[in-house]
Amino acid sequence: MPGSSLPHDSPVPPFPRVALVSSHLGRWPHRRTDWFAALSTACNQLLAVGSRLLFVAGTTTAPYLARCGKLFGHRVETLDSTGVSREDRDQLSVSNADVIIALAVGNRSRTRSLIQRVLEAPPESRPPVWFAHSTSLVSREIAEKWTTQGARPFDPSTRRWPDPPVAEGAIRLATDRMVESGDWLVHCTRESAGRWPGQPQNEYLDDLILGRNSADHSVQATLRKILVERRLRAVSRPVRGLPPAVSFSASPLEELLTRRVFRGHRGRWDFEPYGLAISRAWLAARGARPVVYRRPKDLRGDDPFEQPTESRGPRRRLDWTSEEEWRHPGDVDLSSLSASQGLVLVHRDSDLRYVAGFSRWPVLVLGHFRQDTSAVQ
């Protein structure tokens, strides 16, 4: 019920202590626009200004409460969780609350069991319970049961990032001749699980909570950011102490899709089919070099261009030599990369709208390659 606050018939004192509880958010916060819509609606429209948000370290909502307090005029009260197991920290918040608000509830989650125990207490001896009225956050089964037990639903504000506009004539597609004539090194990007490099933490959190377009950290948004900044940001190497670098692969463009491997232990593909192909000669002139593959026992540890030949995965050994990796120390400044020395890589035709108007380089749709990798369809 957007625009409303806690009703007068709720036994709630002024400036109530509020437990905001939730099942796990997942490793990709920017994907959960529904969750952040529920959080901001609860703080901005359900609660009166000056409410006290209960902070318990290690809970799903904890990273966002300080910013919610600043954005919506609430205080944040920290509860001491020393000696409390991570599994019981929502219980600590709930047991000290005048109001309980459930943002997301898994069907078999501890959050569901916790709220269910609260609702089984006599109405006069329990705090009011609210929950997000959205099937992506709370299942219909749970919502119906809790409503009959006296919990109240609230409607999160609707959010959807608008599709980026496509500028007429702003996309130049790569031709077969461009693909075949270039000696390309490929850099693939991926979605960002956290803030952008150099982005202030508070700005990142505000983007998520307020549902700004800049909260989109998908792989397409990451690629668009690279094109706008004309810079590939170096990342830290797995070996501690070695300088940040940008990695490339000498793998043929037409084989990229067939070379992808899903890494189950990481819950993701080893790379996404989005990024840039850059002239090998252009990169080499700026300090890029092929890595030196060494057996793990022969690694020196002080060579920024060395890479183990293999590593042990959860089920089998992983051979890294097939990546044919090159490495560039530090950021790659793309401002001097001419239109003939680079290609922008996207997976599907539907991705073209994300790079329209931003790319000075031709765009190659990798999905146009036939699965036998022999040609572009």
Language model region names:
Residues 1-170:
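Glycine-biased, small-residue-rich flexible motifs in mid-sequence functional cores and linkers
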Residues 149-377:
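NAD-dependent ADP-ribosyltransferases
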